[in-house]
Regions:
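Amphipathic alpha-helical interface segments
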Residues: 1-97, 123-176
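Histidine-centered, metal-coordinating catalytic motifs and their short helical/loop contexts
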Residues: 94-119
């Protein structure tokens, strides 16, 4: 059985993480720009409302997809590199910080004839509308959840870069 080249694995994962991070940042910026430029309803009230009528929410959907890709690649990295505790802990923080990611992502990716998205509304975040007018946050790219995602990405990338550095140092030492 061939031995896995962990240096190549780390490089592949870093490339994928770079694309995921770029996607998260691009979609987040589009969401923020759209909200900043949307018409204001009740502009003189304490809580001015922005009018996102007609926006299909694609940028938010793509942001959610990228979050799920980050979650999936994190699990793969953890598995390939033998469950490093620092990454297991980072994964736990990610999942605690965005607990409803799969609640929204799975029906977005695999639509079918059920009610999973019937009470979901897309604004600058995806929320589930509750009785009495309250909402349950599913994914919000504007604030803490984005910071949680970026922290997870950083933990994964830092671990992988250190892994490559160790391999590179070992190779250069052996060559001497």
């Amino acid at each position: 059985m061939a031995k896995r080249d962990l240096d190549k694995s780390a490089s592949r994962f870093l490339n994928a993480l770079w694309r995921i991070s770029a996607g998260l940042e691009q979609q987040r910026q589009r969401i923020l720009d759209r909200a900043a430029n949307a018409p204001r309803l009740l502009p003189d009230s304490q809580f001015p409302v922005i009018d996102l009528t007609g926006d299909p929410g694609n940028d938010l959907d793509y942001y959610i997809y990228e979050l799920a890709r980050l979650q999936d690649i994190g699990k793969a990295i953890i598995k390939v590199f033998g469950q490093p505790q620092e990454l297991v802990d980072a994964q736990a923080r990610f999942e605690a910080g965005i607990p409803n990611l799969r609640v929204i992502r799975n029906p977005l990716t695999h639509p079918n004839d059920n009610d999973e998205l019937d009470e979901v509304a897309w604004f600058s975040s995806a929320v589930k509308l509750k009785p009495g007018g309250s909402v349950e946050e599913l994914v919000d790219p504007r604030y803490e959840q984005h910071e949680v995602a970026i922290a997870y990405h950083l933990a994964l990338a830092t671990y992988l870069r250190a892994r490559i550095s160790v391999c590179d140092r070992r190779s250069s030492t052996q060559a001497d």
